[in-house]
Amino acid sequence: MSRKQLALFEPTLVVQALKEAVKKLNPQAQWRNPVMFIVWIGSLLTTCISIAMASGAMPGNALFSVAISGWLWVTVLFANFAEALAEGRSKAQANSLKGVKKTAFARKLREPKYGAAADKVPADQLRKGDIVLVEAGDIIPCDGEVIEGGASVDESAITGESAPVIRESGGDFASVTGGTRILSDWLVIECSVNPGETFLDRMIAMVEGAQRRKTPNEIALTILLIALTIVFLLATATLWPFSAWGGNAVSVTVLVALLVCLIPTTIGGLLSAIGVAGMSRMLGANVVATSGRAVEAAGDVDVLLLDKTGTITLGNRQASEFIPAQGVDEKTLADAAQLASLADETPEGRSIVILAKQRFNLRERDVQSLHATFVPFTAQSRMSGINIDNRMIRKGSVDAIRRHVEANGGHFPADVDQKVDQVARQGATPLVVVEGSRVLGVIALKDIVKGGIKERFAQLRKMGIKTVMITGDNRLTAAAIAAEAGVDDFLAEATPEAKLALIRQYQAEGRLVAMTGDGTNDAPALAQADVAVAMNSGTQAAKEAGNMVDLDSNPTKLIEVVHIGKQMLMTRGSLTTFSIANDVAKYFAIIPAAFAVTYPQLNALNIMRLHSPDSAILSAVIFNALIIVFLIPLALKGVSYKPLTASAMLRRNLWIYGLGGLLVPFIGIKVIDLLLTVCGLV
């Protein structure tokens, strides 16, 4: 579920952004953006010249100088406004989260158990390791792990999802978030963070941009822009002696205007806004990124590790067939399978009970009346079952049942091996049922591949992204599902160690890897991956290891995360192309105007036939300022993103933003020149 989206130019945000834009005129704020700092210095310089001309201390056209100075200040203000508006939208999202934080008291237990004596303490004084009790109606005071109890929790303040979730001790659903509310029952929680370090605190800080640092690509682009600025600065500085030698020195005001129009002010003014907006769009998708670096890395990802269950398949495997071993009746197999599944509360276990009922009218037995011992599934045994009336029935993976049979002195039938292979080749998961040391047969669990997922993987392949399915299934089953889903590769019988090794292997090849995870066993791989999206429903260890948290706990969101990252990189690249292409048109406007008196031959470059030198220079400066405002919506929303190959994407952007960057200034400057002339302002 996504949060309510703010209007692009929300009136209250615009007013606040205008105030912030004025505040950002101070040198300390301007110094952070070298390109706009040059414009700021130029504004100061031309302002001083305008004052000197107006007072008669310097010769020259004071009105023209004032106009140039004014529009240079407007250019700086517009750049500040773009950044302030992006930050304001993020802060508005953060303010909605701050409402979740409430000053409250917590019941700190003296001993780590329910019913122990408790002290009432302010929630903001809880430290890591403290034990607290929360009951129905209470706000959970800190991030932590449930060590006792189970409860229904309302997490809508964090996730935006109204449906309550169950949090209980043990397993992957023991993690709770401060600021959420208990709806029923009680929990004993061990705090896992100190004050100011909660997930909500970090979420607010990241959204507000308080910890936003420039990403590597942003730094590289900034260095390029600085280099271009220095080149144009040196080139402009040489023009004064060049024109003076020709007998008619160009004024400092004109040289400043020329410099400002030639340096890449458009992307320089919007660069910070693009980065802030990228993180804001990520939050709009209910994903919290810990840094801009994480969002940027998402755009560069070329390998996606995707969990099969819930991402590629619907995740609700259902029993579809009983396949008896040679000499075993199918009803006998179904009866044993149902008995072994009576205490199995997983969807797979329930489906086995239902299939036996549908096929052979085997009614569910009363669990209590059986006086049986149920054997739960464990990661070590990889099987479950029941001990009843001297019968030892187990169901589990092929390898686990094989070991069980051999340990009990039995022999695993060759025909069952063939049936297991047959089931696996069909893309189903085989479960083997055994009674004592006698193998009864195989249950086929069929998982359904999500509709449209194959087409999405084809789009990712076009973009040069490799998809790898991660599953605990055996190789045959994994291969069948991988072929049906259209993934490029798969990792079968995956363990935490195997996932970690696979990520390192891809990274050693120079690739960037993205993955999702929710369990403590996923933490090492999440920490190693370049883009690691932890599920909000997962453990605290997983959330700390990842660099993003999906509040919806939807593994499929990883594909959307990559799209948002690529859109941010495309936006930055497109606007950089547009900004640099702009310079060509502004060159044709200002150079002839500035030097036409000294070198009349340069009039040949006045292809726009602008009215006069003053109107040409002023029109270029005005266009240079206004284009920033017109591009703010594009910087905040991002350019239109389509899954294309890198070469096709480059061609598309060059046509739209390269050619557009050349043509738009010619049209814009000419229109402004006509308006200035018609209004008699030049």
Swiss-Prot record:
What are the protein's UniProt keywords?
A: ATP-binding, Cell inner membrane, Cell membrane, Ion transport, Magnesium, Membrane, Metal-binding, Nucleotide-binding, Phosphoprotein, Potassium, Potassium transport, Translocase, Transmembrane, Transmembrane helix, Transport
| Main localisation | membrane
Q: Which CDD domains match?
A: P-type_ATPase_K
Residues bound to ATP: 344, 348, 377-384, 395
Region forming the signal peptide: none
**Record: active site:** 307
Q: How does it sit in the membrane?
A: Multi-pass membrane protein
Residues reported in the UniProt entry to bind Mg(2+):
518, 522
Q: Which Pfam families match?
A: E1-E2_ATPase (PF00122), Hydrolase (PF00702)
Transmembrane segments annotated in the record for this chain: 34-54, 62-82, 219-239, 254-274, 588-608, 616-636, 656-676
Xref: Gene3D superfamilies:
Calcium-transporting ATPase, cytoplasmic domain N, Calcium-transporting ATPase, cytoplasmic transduction domain A, HAD superfamily/HAD-like
Q: Which reaction does it catalyse?
A: K(+)(out) + ATP + H2O = K(+)(in) + ADP + phosphate + H(+)
GO molecular function annotations of the record:
ATP binding; ATP hydrolysis activity; magnesium ion binding; P-type potassium transmembrane transporter activity
Query: Taxonomically, which superkingdom?
Result: Bacteria
Q: Does this UniProt record's set of keywords contain Translocase?
A: yes
The record's similarity note reads: Belongs to the cation transport ATPase (P-type) (TC 3.A.3) family. Type IA subfamily.
* Function per UniProt: Part of the high-affinity ATP-driven potassium transport (or Kdp) system, which catalyzes the hydrolysis of ATP coupled with the electrogenic transport of potassium into the cytoplasm. This subunit is responsible for energy coupling to the transport system and for the release of the potassium ions to the cytoplasm.
User: How is the quaternary structure described?
Assistant: The system is composed of three essential subunits: KdpA, KdpB and KdpC.
Report the protein name in the record. Potassium-transporting ATPase ATP-binding subunit
Q: Which organism is it from?
A: Escherichia coli O157:H7
What gene name is given for the protein in this entry?
kdpB
